[in-house]
Amino acid sequence: LGNIDTLTSQSSLFTFQKYINEKGDSLNYRQLLSDYDNNSKYPLVIFLHGAGERGNDNEAQLKWGVKNFTSDNIMKIHPSIVLAPQCPKNMSWGNFSEDDMSLLPSPTKPMQLLIELVKKTINTMPVDVNRVYITGLSMGGIGTFDAISRYPDLFAAAVPVCGGGDVTKANIIAKIPIWVFHGVRDTTLSAKLSQNMINALIKEGAEPGFTLYPEVGHFSWIAAYSDPMMMEWLYRQHK
């Protein structure tokens, strides 16, 4: 029971929010704030959930990964602003061809709204614009590659977990610090998708991090988000 209580109290640290733009389009999200004062600037972390957590309850997106940002260690040593948006059912973060992972011309509606929300947050909260980070798992890992490929100037670092991306966009994202995680035994999204991105990035002169878990299937996010080295690395990155 103690564990369930802990998880519930971790969730309650995320306030319920809704972004609505001028057209009336909306995106549900949860927001985590460490203790902060307006005289300081704080890193902004965007977390993109996977396909199973889509919906409109503004709750399911906290199921995996993002609650690790509520640990005392992170909140005290690396106070930050964390946004965890929820993608509606039957939509996705990334817009790409299923055949070859090539990026399609326009972002999805949820991605468009997310970028609007990020820009609004930067304008209205004490965000360090040189420390905007994005991470996500599965559908959110693909979304992470999608976001940095479309908006490379926005992000200081990215951590795509069991995702994949468009190898032809490697030149656009080569200067962004990236650490990729994947399970070798993943049958939902092949680890080759991550490997292909890593190879393409290295060809462009980048030095991405790549952690492959030999015995892990699709759930590589459990290990990735509880890796203190990954967290320390993420918060060290800045433009």
Residue positions per predicted region:
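Gly/Ser-rich "nucleophile elbow"/oxyanion-hole loop immediately N-terminal to the catalytic nucleophile
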Residues: D35-S40, G94-S138
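Alpha-helical scaffolding within the catalytic cores
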Residues: K63-N73, C162-N171, K192, N196
